[in-house]
Amino acid sequence: MLIAAGGTGGHMFPAQALAEAMLNRGWRVKLTTDARGARYTGGFPHSTQIEEISSATFARGGIAAKIVAPFKIGAGVLRALLSFRRDRPAVVVGFGGYPTIPALAAAFLMKLPRMIHEQNGVLGRVNTAFASRVDAIACGTWPTDLPEGVEGYHTGNPVRKAILERAEAGYICPGDYPMEVLVIGGSQGARILSDVIPPAIASLPMAMLRNLRISHQARDEDQERVAKYYAENGVRAEVEPFFQDVPRRMTEAQLVISRSGASSVADLSVIGRPAILIPYAAATGDHQTANARGLVEAGGAIMVPESKASPEALAEQIHSVLDNPTAAMQMAAAAARFGKPEATEMLAQMVEGLAEKGQKT
């Protein structure tokens, strides 16, 4: 089978989860992605065949980049067609992002069994373009806003083995002892979290602050100033552009402060941790708000819109969780109830069913 995924953790982590499941079922798995996506392939099983393909986006870059984009995509489609003729996949699964265009387009032209998985509550641009050109759509967030006449199947968002192994891990509620707070802005970090979270934490009462240890994922360009701010304000913090061990840190955390990308919400709910979610306001179709809504309504998270995410507002919410162990425990339990640890297996069954149907036609 072939998996195609775009260049962010939001696309790559669920793709990794499916690769792990399909390899365990005895499948040969190939992944196609771009150079950005290749940064996230370190966690994929070693037996996954990984190929970087030519693709481009119309959403970023200047006029020159937009002129070149169709030619890059066309070259990627041609390469995918040639590759599929040499090694015909039984099924092609796209996880969104521009790097999935070549594989999905080639699968459409060759009439191969094909499907997409949409992690968010709103279809991304590429998944929207292919929604009526695939055999099935798996949805990670429910309900998902789908084009008229298009049906989706709710599988949930698959999570990596490292997350699944920690499903409903025991939660230590906040108290007068060392506490962990994890701050993650998605796989690419988030500037607003680097702007508002450090002063919010630094303003907490000293009795609470002395117990806190912060793990803060910040962008490369923000790392130094964030680390300096924490140090100057007496906050124990580890600041890195990317944590390879997020599953461990999330499991040990009393509170997680995060964007509400679909993968982050899935990880939080499978492990079961209280969270403060700050949806990315510029996300396509405001899909991060849609992603957060279910977990918030279930009682597992607090949502703070980006427009209201001041240091004062965040400090109040952080304090409300860490100063109330009973409420924090209830949030952790609610998050775990909301989780769908079976999502990976459901998606794997869907993939196998589609491949089987393709063999009969």
UniProtKB/Swiss-Prot annotation:
Gene3D superfamilies: Glycogen Phosphorylase B (3.40.50.2000). UDP-N-acetyl-alpha-D-glucosamine binds at residues 8-10, 120, 160, 187, 288. It is a peripheral membrane protein. One of its GO terms (molecular function) is undecaprenyldiphospho-muramoylpentapeptide beta-N-acetylglucosaminyltransferase activity. The keyword Cell cycle applies. Its EC number is 2.4.1.227. One of its GO terms (biological process) is cell division. It catalyses: di-trans,octa-cis-undecaprenyl diphospho-N-acetyl-alpha-D-muramoyl-L-alanyl-D-glutamyl-meso-2,6-diaminopimeloyl-D-alanyl-D-alanine + UDP-N-acetyl-alpha-D-glucosamine = di-trans,octa-cis-undecaprenyl diphospho-[N-acetyl-alpha-D-glucosaminyl-(1->4)]-N-acetyl-alpha-D-muramoyl-L-alanyl-D-glutamyl-meso-2,6-diaminopimeloyl-D-alanyl-D-alanine + UDP + H(+). Pathway: Cell wall biogenesis; peptidoglycan biosynthesis. Coiled coil: none annotated. Keywords: Cell cycle, Cell division, Cell inner membrane, Cell membrane, Cell shape, Cell wall biogenesis/degradation, Glycosyltransferase, Membrane, Peptidoglycan synthesis, Transferase. GO terms for cellular component: plasma membrane. It is found in: Cell inner membrane. InterPro entries: GlcNAc_MurG (IPR006009), Glyco_trans_28_C (IPR007235), GlycoTrans_28_N (IPR004276). Disulfide bonds: none annotated. NCBIfam families: murG. HAMAP family: MurG (MF_00033). Cell wall formation. Catalyzes the transfer of a GlcNAc subunit on undecaprenyl-pyrophosphoryl-MurNAc-pentapeptide (lipid intermediate I) to form undecaprenyl-pyrophosphoryl-MurNAc-(pentapeptide)GlcNAc (lipid intermediate II). Belongs to the glycosyltransferase 28 family. MurG subfamily. This is UDP-N-acetylglucosamine--N-acetylmuramyl-(pentapeptide) pyrophosphoryl-undecaprenol N-acetylglucosamine transferase. It comes from Roseobacter denitrificans (strain ATCC 33942 / OCh 114). The lineage of its organism: Bacteria, Pseudomonadati, Pseudomonadota, Alphaproteobacteria, Rhodobacterales.
